[in-house]
Structures are given as structure tokens and as C-alpha cells.
Amino acid sequence: MKKLVIMMIVSCLMMLCSVGFAADDHKALAKQQQVAEKMLDAFDGEPMPLFTQVSAGFNANLKKAVDEKAFTELQKQVKQKFGTMKEAKFFTFQRFDQADRVTFIASFTKEKIVSMIFAFDKQNKLVDFAFTPVQQPEAKAAK
């Protein structure tokens, strides 16, 4: 009976510890998701956020690399290549030693599935992003 009680106490302690460790991840995800959603808003039509609002979440190097003119050109390229965004859904949050990655899966008028990946530093600033169409395997013809 004592062994059973001790096992239950140890199990409860392990569960409580895992909840405590996840609290920091939740805070980071919340901040990073806000930045990513501002980026998504810049591609989904109306109302378009101002570049200053979108770039507020950029780190210094990304701000140098992507100015307002370059960002406007990026919006045009995305619209030309993928079409208009219909919807975007949160997909994954990955933590690494030096950076975190937040991925959304979006649907556009010209591309059914686009993976929108956002990389963040440990200060929750956006350092890089990539939009990649996901090719679905073609269904084999029935014989």
C-alpha cells in the first residue's frame, strides 16, 4: 500500500513539474504568434496593417534587410505567385537552443497549401521567414 501511495505522489509531482516548465514556452509562443499573425494580416487582404506595425516585431538585421519598399514588393510577389489568402491556421511551435520556429499552414486561391514558417530569436523578434507551397501527392488512377 505504501508503494502505491509513493508512486501516486511521484506521478503527481512529475505532472506538476511538466506544467511549470511549459509556462515559459506558452509565453514565448503567445508573443511570437502575435508577430506572425501581423505578417499573415499583411497578405490576407483587408485591412492591411501598416509596415511600421508589421516590422515592430522584426529584429535589427531583418529591419535592415526588409524595408518598406522590399516588403511591398514581397506582398506583390506573394499575391502573384499564390493568389489571395483564404485562410491560415496555426500548425507547429518548435523550440531550439538559439531560435524558435512557428509554422502556419495557409490556403490561397492559386495554391491549396502553403507552409508559412517564421523563425524567432530568444528575444521573440522575427529573424527570418519563408513561404513554401506544399505539393500534395497525386492520386493514382484506378485500374
What are these regions (language model features)?
Residues 7-17:
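Bacterial N-terminal signal peptides
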Residues 95-143:
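Exposed beta-sheet edge and beta->alpha loop/turn motif
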Residues 51-97:
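Short solvent-exposed beta->alpha transition segments
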Residues 18-45:
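Short, low-complexity N-terminal intrinsically disordered segments enriched in polar/charged residues
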Residues 21, 54, 117-118:
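Short low-polarity hydrophobic stretches
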Residues 1-5:
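Positively charged n-region of N-terminal signal peptides that target proteins for export
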